[in-house]
Each structure stands twice: as C-alpha cells, then as structure tokens.
Amino acid sequence: MEFKERLRRRRSVRKYLSRPVEREVLDTVLREALAAPSSRNSHSTHLRVVTDPETIARIARMRDYGSAFLEHAPAVVLVEGDRTATDLWRENAAITATALLFAATDAGLASCWVHVNGRPCLKDQPDGAQAEDYLREFLPVPAEHGILCAVALGYSDFEPAALPPFDAGTHIHWPEK
C-alpha cells in the first residue's frame, strides 16, 4: 500500500468483528511499529499485548468515557514508555503508537487510540483516580513504565463515512520575508 493511500484509509474504528487477529499478524504489526524513530535512538517504547477477552473487558472499564468499545476488540496494545530511559518517553511512545496505527492499516486491521496517561477514570473528577493507576492494579506494568495509550486492533467490516473536506492550506504557515 502506498503511503498516501495509507494516510487516506487510516481511520479510528470502534466496531470489530469477533474474529481473532492471528498472532503472526500482530507480531508483524508490532515489530513494524517498534521500527519507528525515537529520541536519540533510545527505543524507550514497549508494547504490552492483551488478547484475553476478560482482561480486555477490564481494560475497557478504565474510564467512564471513551474506552467502553475496547471490550469488543480482539486485541488491545498498551503503548508504554520507559521513564528511566528518556524524559521524552511520551513523545517516543506517541510516535510508536502512530506507526502502530498505520502498520495495522497496512495489514488490513482496524484500530483506535484511547489515551491513558493523565486521564481520570471519571470524566467529572479530573483530579480523582487515574486510568493508568487502574490498569496497574491488574496488569504487570513495570513501575518505570508510563502508559501513554491503549490501541484497539481487530478486523472490521465497518465502513466509516467519508472524511469531511479539509483545507490543509489553512494549517500551513510560511515565514514572512
């Protein structure tokens, strides 16, 4: 698939078929994502793969908003960053997560990013319990790892509506002479 086509086709999809994603497909997608650039080539990002439906259901309950759909994904990948490797672990993890979304598209998988880091479990209690702490209660995430996001992966027959027109020219700014 050409890069431009991949950019055009990649969409956040929240509806998945019950068909499991083959381990070989997941492994390929994950390895491609980890080939993404990182600050000072630190490779500070780690990917935690969850395919157990009961564990995925628990992950889906990490927030009372925007994460329930995860329960129907055949695979969820937690994108983690080693906070001891670099102070840019969030940026590195975001680059890897973006590469993961495009690698999934290339493999014929649907995907959707759900942010974890700095997000409360309850939307109306921003200073309350945090989604990241909730996940640490039942997942073996090392203390030195921060969890940036969860990415749902799966096959889907859902066809999202066409993207609305967007004038990229209004977001490109050239310095004045």
Regions from the PLM with identified roles:
Residues M1-K177:
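Acidic, surface-exposed loops and disordered segments
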